Amino acid sequence: MYRKDLDNYLKQRLPKAVFLYGEFDFFIHYYIQTISALFKGNNPDTETSLFYASDYEKSQIATLLEQDSLFGGSSLVILKLDFALHKKFKENDINPFLKALERPSHNRLIIGLYNAKSDTTKYKYTSEIIVKFFQKSPLKDEAICVRFFTPKAWESLKFLQERANFLHLDISGHLLNALFEINNEDLSVSFNDLDKLAVLNAPITLEDIQELSSNAGDMDLQKLILGLFLKKSVLDIYDYLLKEGKKDADILRGLERYFYQLFLFFAHIKTTGLMDAKEVLGYAPPKEIVENYAKNALRLKEAGYKRVFEIFRLWHLQSMQGQKELGFLYLTPIQKIINP
């Protein structure tokens, strides 16, 4: 089935097993999250086990699907397989996983096979084999396969409008289109920006989009971030940004967003030992950007992040009290935390 079919299916029932694949990774990621949330909403005692290509273990996964939860709940197994790294995974593994789900239980399986643009032929071959296992399963329509294609611009805008409606976001079609264009028609980035805009809890303006969108003003802010990590004269850069018309509040907001993302990378790397941008950000930036995030994230320890976020709290508080150009006061202490 395709995305529209999946949406209709999920309105009526939940599958026991689902295989998500195709050429658009963002939809694979989005529907893994969506279906997981539906499973948990239907059975709050669900225990989730997440496996990536690097920690894939066939026997452990089969055991989780075969047995009941220790506390009488159910098991949800999620396989996020990056095709380029899926050496441990064999297509034939799918058969025992589906077999395990034939017995009466509330256990569930979600498989997301992320695309490999470097080897589309092999990806297609692997996907087709998995689809055949699903089609032959006695689970019948409880085991579904969904193929995603890169959406056209109008499809992306429709998807964003549906998300805006879900968030009760007051944004016109014209401004939604502007957000999409500012983000270079990147659906995943625009999707995440809607969540940020929803925090405002007010009708959205073009200025809101320019201030909060992930790419607006990024080049100037990147100069400041680079200065912080490379021990450059950040006060000169900050002064330049102010003279160019950048607001102190905008600079603070941009720094908060960046360091929050850094902390997410830091926590994810420390917890899993992996650097999975899709899991952290919800989309996959270019390799160079991911590597830079990871490198900078590990420059600080947990205590360092706490100190930086405390500075941001004070900066925001004093800004609300009417004090201006607080970067002159706080940027140097932040730089010293990064470069002790």
From Swiss-Prot:
<comment type="function">
    <text>Could be the functional equivalent of DNA polymerase III delta subunit (HolA).</text>
</comment>
<dbReference type="GO" id="GO:0009360">
    <property type="term" value="C:DNA polymerase III complex"/>
</dbReference>
<keyword id="KW-0235">DNA replication</keyword>
<protein>
    <recommendedName>
        <fullName>Protein jhp_1168</fullName>
    </recommendedName>
</protein>
<dbReference type="GO" id="GO:0006261">
    <property type="term" value="P:DNA-templated DNA replication"/>
</dbReference>
<dbReference type="InterPro" id="IPR027417">
    <property type="entry name" value="P-loop_NTPase"/>
</dbReference>
<dbReference type="InterPro" id="IPR005790">
    <property type="entry name" value="DNA_polIII_delta"/>
</dbReference>
<keyword id="KW-0808">Transferase</keyword>
<keyword id="KW-0239">DNA-directed DNA polymerase</keyword>
<dbReference type="GO" id="GO:0003887">
    <property type="term" value="F:DNA-directed DNA polymerase activity"/>
</dbReference>
<keyword id="KW-0548">Nucleotidyltransferase</keyword>
<dbReference type="GO" id="GO:0003677">
    <property type="term" value="F:DNA binding"/>
</dbReference>
<comment type="subunit">
    <text>Seems to interact with H.pylori HolB.</text>
</comment>
